């Protein structure tokens, strides 16, 4: 029996979570999220090791074992909170892979390659998920929908993770790329922001939009950029894989 067909680009949406969270909902959200985060972090470690830094390798972090990368809050609590709050998308993070950038061959360019490894891996996973849509119609009906929902969420989660991480704010990957490519006169002031990077993100993603809403202003600019960029990349991947 033929199962569900792969979606056209116009119908592609992450699986919405209903009021009552079920094991099915968890299985189609948590599995692709853990895979996306695990491969993202492992990729940093693999590239760092290839470029001369053995820190992650010695600590056992160059691994595709999710248990090596799980952060209790970022990988478990935060996604669960988003699920329970019926967020339109699921997001999370893992423990950052430790990298000694001074040990890399060609330190600044090496930092760029290590940083790009995570988002590039997520885009590759998203491309594989989109390509796999074509296989769903050949699966038994009782498993096709589950596989399709996992693939749809894998596509969205991986692209979102890649796009968000490329924001040029340290310690995000985009911030590392900027530090490696900018002239030192610009890179040094940006590097000084790293200890406050997460606070800056919370400010521009949550506090600034909330403050703007009090005055009738839409200041949620970064979320709009991430959302629009994510949609564009998803559409591009669907075209590339013949799903448009």
Explain the meaning of each model-derived region:
Residues 2-244:
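Hydrophobic transmembrane alpha-helices and their immediate loop junctions
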């Amino acid at each position: 029996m033929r199962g569900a067909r792969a979606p056209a680009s116009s119908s592609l949406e992450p699986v919405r979570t209903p009021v009552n969270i079920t094991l099915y909902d968890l299985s189609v959200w948590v599995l692709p999220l853990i895979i996306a985060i695990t491969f993202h972090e492992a990729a940093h470690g693999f590239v760092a090791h290839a470029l001369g830094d053995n820190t992650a390798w010695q600590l056992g972090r160059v691994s595709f074992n999710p248990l090596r990368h799980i952060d209790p809050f970022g990988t478990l609590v935060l996604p669960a909170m988003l699920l329970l709050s019926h967020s339109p998308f699921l997001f999370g993070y893992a423990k950052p892979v430790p990298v000694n950038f001074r040990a890399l061959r060609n330190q600044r360019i090496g930092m760029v390659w290590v940083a790009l490894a995570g988002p590039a891996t997520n885009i590759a996973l998203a491309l594989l998920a989109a390509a796999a849509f074509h296989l769903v119609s050949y699966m038994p009906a009782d498993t096709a929908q589950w596989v399709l929902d996992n693939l749809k969420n894998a596509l969205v989660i991986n692209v979102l993770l890649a796009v968000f991480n490329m924001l040029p704010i340290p310690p995000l990957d985009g911030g590392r790329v900027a530090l490696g490519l900018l002239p030192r006169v610009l890179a040094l002031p940006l590097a000084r922001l790293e200890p406050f990077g997460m606070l800056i993100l919370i400010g521009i993603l949550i506090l600034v939009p909330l403050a703007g809403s009090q005055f009738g202003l839409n200041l949620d600019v970064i979320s709009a950029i991430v959302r629009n960029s994510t949609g564009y990349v998803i559409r591009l991947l669907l075209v590339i894989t013949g799903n448009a």
